[in-house]
Curated annotation (Swiss-Prot):
Annotated NCBIfam families: PRK05751.1-2, secB
Official protein name in the record: Protein-export protein SecB 2
SUPFAM superfamilies: SecB-like
Function: One of the proteins required for the normal export of preproteins out of the cell cytoplasm. It is a molecular chaperone that binds to a subset of precursor proteins, maintaining them in a translocation-competent state. It also specifically binds to its receptor SecA.
Pfam families: SecB (PF02556)
Subunit structure, interactors included: Homotetramer, a dimer of dimers. One homotetramer interacts with 1 SecA dimer.
GO cellular component: cytoplasm
Gene3D superfamilies listed in its UniProt record: SecB-like (3.10.420.10)
Family that this chain belongs to: Belongs to the SecB family.
Top-rank taxon, per record: Bacteria
Cellular compartment(s): Cytoplasm
GO annotation (BP), single: protein folding
Length: 147
């Protein structure tokens, strides 16, 4: 190994909540109905290069819950982090951001979603762990759409 080679390194600089929203739809009528919920989950990951070594990742989770086909609530959080990554190729950095960094932020986002739903007067959801590696591989293997 040459002396001028940079060793791969990864550092979490900051974890923070960028945005939170919770909307109860059709209240108070929704609290009087028999509870038979179904929920849709949407996950979005956006990365921003701050400079050569620092990157911001935004993990947005949206939960839309219906009861008997009527929308009841929408909960959304954007959990963000700033990460320092050095000594890696662009492809490696992309992989680390979309997998490891997303996994790092998920527990924070999950806690906020759960808290919002409970404070909104609803039963908690059990958000299962997310396989960000599989999501990343699927995204990489999907053909890119042209607009």
């Amino acid at each position: 190994m040459q002396n001028n080679e940079i060793q791969p390194s990864f550092l979490i600089q900051k974890v923070y909540t960028k945005d939170v929203s919770f909307e109860t739809i059709n209240s108070p009528a929704c609290f009087k109905e028999q509870w038979n919920p179904s929920s849709d989950f949407n996950i979005d990951i956006n990365t921003t290069k701050i400079n050569n070594e620092n990157f911001e990742l935004d993990l947005t989770i949206t939960v839309t819950t219906k009861n008997n086909e009527t929308n009841v609530y929408i909960a959304e959080v954007t959990q963000s982090g700033i990460f320092t990554i050095t000594g890696m190729s662009e492809e490696q950095i992309d992989s680390v951001l979309n997998t490891y960094c997303a996994n790092t932020l998920f527990p924070y986002a999950k806690r906020i979603i759960d808290s919002s739903i409970i404070k909104g007067g609803f039963l908690p959801l059990n958000l299962a762990p997310i396989n960000f590696d599989a999501i990343y591989l699927q995204k990489k293997s999907s053909p890119k759409r042209e607009h």
